[in-house]
Amino acid sequence: MRGSLNVYLHEVEPIRLGVNRLLDGADPILSAYRAHRITPATAQRRLGRLERRFAAYAVQIAAVAKVPPALRSAQRSYAHTFVLEDAYLSALVAAVPEHDFDDLPDTQARQRAAIIGWRIQLEVLAERRGVDLPADLQAAGRGEIAPSPGGS
């Protein structure tokens, strides 16, 4: 039982941390775009690359196979947050040239709830099995979920 949770964490953690690092890269692009330090075409190109890398993470999280039974529902919800974020990023990329951000999907609340639900289930299972979780896991679901074209 303990081993299956460790296997799961070993598979999910690099994805979670990679996504965090990747999304941290969106704010400097959007900031430079807002300040007119880069053109809309450059911002769109950079955000497009970021979105394509994110899409690869979405595939990876969906492909996680060794999910402990007690986490399966939470894992499906967590993986779905990647679908929502990818849809948001795709819409953001498309909106950049015309600076038309009014119709961006508003999925932050749904994503936050799913991520927090996943984190809570993970914490409960880890406590029951005596498994230590990564120290930064408490931050999951807090803070900004999606890069904001208007700034935070």
Can you annotate each of these PLM segments?
Residues M1-L50, L84-S152:
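C-terminal amphipathic alpha-helix
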Residues R53-A79, A94-E98, E127-L133:
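Short, solvent-exposed, charged loop/turn and helix-capping segments
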